[in-house]
C-alpha cells in the first residue's frame, strides 16, 4: 500500500517494520478526538482562506461519515497505514478525492497526535473524577451505616488502639480527596492546545491558532512550538495520579483481604465480588481485591516506563514517544475498573461489629488510655508507661486482660488509680476520649463525614466545570 509520506522513498516498507512501528492496534481509541481535531483544523483553514469553503464542507462531511462507520464497527483499520491519523486521512481521501489531501495543510502528525492525546486525557480526567466521587460516596455511606461500630486500629499489623470503623473508612476518603486534587493539575496541563505547532517550528500558512483553540475548547495555547510537540508531562502526571490512586486502593484491598479471612472475621464480602476454587468447595476467594493489588504494580510500571523513555530524548518529537499511549490507555482502563469495583465492594460488604468489639474486649488496646489516666493524675508519662507495661505483663501471665482486673487490683498497681478506672478504660471511653479535631470520637467522625459531603459537592462542581470546557469542542 502506498504511503502518504512515500515520495522520498524508492522501496516499500518491510512488513516487519510496518508491524513493529504501527500503533493502530492501540491508538484507534482516539478516533473521535482525531476527527474533532481535523474538523477544527479544516474549519480554521477555510476561515483563513487557505482552503475553500467547498473543500471544508467536503472534509467535514467525510469525517462525519467516517466517525459513524467507526462508531458502528464498520471501519477496517490497516496496519500498513501505521496509526489512527493516517487511517482516517487515507479513507477520507479515498471518499472525497482531492479535497481530502488538503486537510493536512499547515499541520504535522506531531501536533495532530499531540492534540488528540490532550483531548483524550481531558475526557479521562472527567471520568476519573466521577469515579473517585462515587468511591468517596461509598465510603461515607458505609461509615454512616456502621457509625457505632468500634474496631481495633493497627500499627505494625498488631492491635494498637480502638477506633470507629467509620474513622477507618474516612481515612481512605481523605486519600481519594488528594487523588482528586491531583486531577486538577493533570487537567490544567492537558488543557493546553498544541495544534499549530507543526512538526516543531510552527506554520508558514498564516493559520489562526486562537480560532482553533476556541473550536476545540482549550483554555490556552502552548507558548513554544517545540515544547508543544515534545511535551508529555501531562501524561506522566496522569500516570502519577494513577499510581497513587491505585496504591490507595491496593492498601484498601489488602485490608479487605485480611478482614474477610477467618483469622480476622471482621467483614464478609458479597458473593458477587468473590470467586470460588476449582478443587476446594468451601473457598470464597477475594480475587477482585487481589487483582487490584496486583494491577497496582502494573500501573507503577507504566509510570516508570514513560519516565525512562522520556529522560534521554532530545527535542522535539522522537518515535520513542509513541510509547506514551499504551501505558496511559491501560492505566485509564485499570483505574476505571479498580475504582468502580471497589465502590461496589464497599457498598456490598457486611461488617461484623460484634466480633470486632469482642476482639477489643479480649485485648490490651486500652493500655494507652490506662497510661493516660495516670498521666492526668500527675504521674510522668514515662513512669505511667512503665507501670502499665508491667500490668499488661502481669495480665498475660495470669491469662486475663486489663478489664478483668478489679478496682482493688488497680490500686495495688498504683495508688493513683481510683474507682473510675474501669469506666475510663472501657473501649467506648477510649474512643470517646479522642475528641481532638482529627480524632476518632463519634462527634469527630460525624464532622469528617459532613465535611466529606461538602468536599464531594465541591468536587462535583469542578467536574461540571471540566465538562463545560470539554463541551466547547465543536464536533
What is the predicted function of each stretch?
Residues 1-202, 207-211, 275-276, 287, ...:
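A helix-coil-helix interface module used to build multimeric assemblies
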Residues 1-37, 98-99, 280-475:
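Glycine-rich cofactor/substrate-binding loops
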Residues 41, 62-69, 91, 95, ...:
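Generic, well-ordered alpha-helical scaffold segments in large soluble proteins
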Residues 118-125, 129, 144, 152, ...:
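Charged, flexible cofactor/metal-binding loops and thiol motifs
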Residues 140, 144-147, 188-191, 257, ...:
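Alpha-helical coiled-coil oligomerization motifs
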Amino acid at each position: 500500500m502506498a504511503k502518504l509520506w512515500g515520495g522520498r522513498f524508492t522501496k516499500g516498507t518491510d512488513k516487519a517494520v510496518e508491524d513493529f512501528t504501527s500503533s493502530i492496534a492501540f491508538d484507534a481509541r482516539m478516533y473521535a478526538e482525531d476527527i474533532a481535531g481535523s474538523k477544527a483544523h479544516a474549519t480554521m483553514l477555510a476561515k483563513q482562506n487557505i482552503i475553500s469553503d467547498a473543500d471544508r464542507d467536503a472534509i467535514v462531511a467525510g469525517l462525519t461519515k467516517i466517525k459513524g462507520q467507526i462508531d458502528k464497527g464498520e471501519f477496517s483499520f490497516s496496519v500498513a497505514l501505521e496509526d489512527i491519523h493516517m487511517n482516517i486521512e487515507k479513507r477520507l481521501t479515498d471518499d472525497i478525492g482531492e479535497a481530502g489531501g488538503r486537510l493536512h495543510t499547515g499541520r504535522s502528525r506531531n501536533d495532530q497526535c499531540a492534540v488528540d492525546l490532550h483531548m483524550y486525557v481531558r475526557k479521562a480526567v472527567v471520568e476519573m473524577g466521577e469515579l473517585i466521587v462515587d468511591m468517596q460516596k461509598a465510603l461515607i455511606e458505609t461509615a454512616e451505616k456502621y457509625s457505632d461500630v468500634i474496631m481495633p486500629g493497627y500499627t505494625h499489623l498488631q492491635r494498637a488502639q480502638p477506633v470507629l470503623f467509620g474513622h477507618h473508612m474516612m481515612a481512605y476518603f481523605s486519600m481519594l480527596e488528594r487523588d482528586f486534587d491531583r486531577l486538577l493539575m493533570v487537567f490544567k496541563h492537558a488543557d493546553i492546545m498544541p495544534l499549530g505547532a507543526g512538526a516543531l517550528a510552527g506554520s508558514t500558512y498564516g493559520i489562526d491558532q486562537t480560532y482553533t483553540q476556541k473550536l476545540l475548547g482549550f483554555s490556552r495555547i502552548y507558548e513554544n512550538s517545540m515544547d508543544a510537540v515534545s511535551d508529555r508531562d501531562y501524561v506522566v502526571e496522569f500516570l502519577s495520579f494513577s499510581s497513587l490512586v491505585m496504591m490507595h486502593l491496593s492498601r484498601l484491598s489488602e485490608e479487605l483481604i485480611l478482614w474477610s479471612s477467618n483469622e480476622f472475621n471482621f467483614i464478609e464480602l458479597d458473593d458477587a465480588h468473590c470467586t470460588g476454587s476449582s478443587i476446594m468447595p468451601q473457598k470464597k476467594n477475594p480475587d477482585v481485591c487481589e487483582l487490584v493489588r496486583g494491577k497496582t504494580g502494573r500501573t507503577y510500571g507504566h509510570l516508570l516506563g514513560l519516565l525512562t523513555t522520556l529522560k534521554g530524548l532530545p527535542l522535539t518529537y522522537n518515535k520513542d514517544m509513541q510509547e506514551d499511549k499504551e501505558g496511559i490507555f491501560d492505566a485509564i482502563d485499570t483505574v476505571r475498573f479498580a475504582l468502580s469495583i471497589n465502590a461496589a465492594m464497599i457498598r456490598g460488604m457486611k461488617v461484623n461489629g460484634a466480633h470486632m468489639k469482642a476482639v477489643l474486649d479480649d485485648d490490651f488496646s486500652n493500655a494507652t488510655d490506662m497510661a493516660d489516666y495516670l498521666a492526668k493524675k500527675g504521674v510522668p508519662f514515662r513512669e505511667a508507661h512503665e507501670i502499665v507495661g508491667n500490668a499488661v505483663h502481669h495480665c498475660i501471665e495470669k491469662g486475663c486482660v486489663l478489664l478483668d482486673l478489679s478496682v482493688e487490683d488497680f490500686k495495688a498497681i498504683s495508688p493513683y488509680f481510683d474507682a473510675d478506672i474501669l469506666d475510663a478504660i472501657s473501649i467506648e471511653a477510649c474512643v470517646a476520649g479522642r475528641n481532638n479535631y482529627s480524632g476518632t470520637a463519634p462527634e469527630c467522625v460525624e464532622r469528617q463525614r459532613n465535611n466529606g459531603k461538602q468536599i464531594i459537592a465541591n468536587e462535583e462542581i469542578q467536574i461540571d466545570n471540566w465538562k463545560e470546557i470539554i463541551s466547547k469542542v465543536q464536533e
